Amino acid sequence: MVRILLFCLALLVAGPAFAIKPLAQYWARPDTLGLKYQSLTLTTSDRVHLAAWLVEPSAGAPDQHTTIVVAGGDSGNMASNIFTAATLAGAGYRVLLFDYRGFGHSDAFAINQNYLYYPEFATDARAALAEARRRSPSQRVGLMGFSMGSLVGSEAAATTHCDVLVTIAYPASPQHVVAHYQRIRPERPIILPAEAATYSQVAPKVNCPWLFIAGTDDQATTLADTLAVAHAASRRQRREVLPVPGDHPQSMGAFSEDNLAPRCLAALRRLLASPAAAGKG
């Protein structure tokens, strides 16, 4: 019952999709769920300091020799992802959670909430990947992005050494996302950064194995757009699409809801076992 109440609170704190609404205060920390962790401070290439939590695999779990960096969505802070961290830690993964600039306890950053995303968030994801690699140079390092986090996470994976990429509710076409929300809530503009004009060039540059998890009823980040990106990959690029029931918010529970997490963990293990990702671990 306590876990259910905490999960409901996490959803409430996270707020609506595609509205950049960072929170400074953590509603919980990993040890709220009994997870062993340490607090870190990361430094980006442009000298911004980011708050982070490094969560250890749960006692008795089989060591996967893999660190998963989690890039969260566009609201709340890294506390919103502690249930995902608990699932991954319980399966034997080390997990690095971090706050984007302007989120949580990271350095301040001026944010216009009408933006879909900021390119600087990709810089933050790169810093998290680099720190995970520095701490475990002989192990695999992957990135898991949720919604906006999958957009900036894919940019990071395209330009930084990454052994596996997992995206949940992936905005394959930022322009389609904007068009969708302009139809259903025309009173509120959504602004794309200039860099979004060339975002379609990012996916072909992601050479690590990539797992797409997409909601079958997601009207914002559609399964059709996700399949188009996956099918456009070259034969050398390993891509797997896992459809899950539900809309955009429901798909975000891929690694925290009991009815979805086992399938998603199994897909992650398959991808890590592929030759492209199995060189370490």
Q: Each predicted region: which residue ranges?
A:
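An N-terminal hydrophobic leader/cap segment in hydrolases
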Residues: 5, 15-44, 48-57
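C-terminal catalytic histidine-bearing segment of alpha/beta-hydrolase fold enzymes
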Residues: 237-281
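Alpha/beta-hydrolase active-site loop
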Residues: 114-135
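Conserved alpha/beta-hydrolase
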Residues: 88-108
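The serine-hydrolase catalytic nucleophile loop
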Residues: 74-87, 100, 224
